[in-house]
UniProtKB/Swiss-Prot annotation:
Annotated localization: Mitochondrion inner membrane
Gene symbol of the encoding locus: COA3
Keyword Transmembrane: yes
Lineage, highest ranks first: Eukaryota, Fungi, Dikarya, Ascomycota, Saccharomycotina
Swiss-Prot/TrEMBL GO biological process terms: mitochondrial cytochrome c oxidase assembly
Transmembrane segments: 49-71
Topology relative to the membrane: Single-pass membrane protein
Protein name, UniProt field: Cytochrome c oxidase assembly factor 3, mitochondrial
Domain of life: Eukaryota
Amino acid sequence: MSQDPHNGKGTFEVHKQPQPGLKVFRKGKYIDPKTFQMSPALIRARRPFFVRNMLALAGLTGFVAGIYGYTMYSLRTDDFGDVPIPPLDPEEIKKLQSKYSDDSKA
């Protein structure tokens, strides 16, 4: 049975327990604190997973490169000739020409 935290006075009692200090940078058990290199135990523990991780990395890299390559291959033949371009007023063309000619001089 759980206790109701309401104390009958319209307020709640808050029981604060002392919190240990927040340690942002904890000492690693398997890393040398002076050189920040992995210990031999950590290297031995990671060794069985190395080949599997590298194969997964190669697979994901190949998959992403394949998608990118297929996208570039598919889009290289698209000329966007069917997209209508709205006509511009001669005043707007002069404005744009003066704007971009000023930018190129600067």
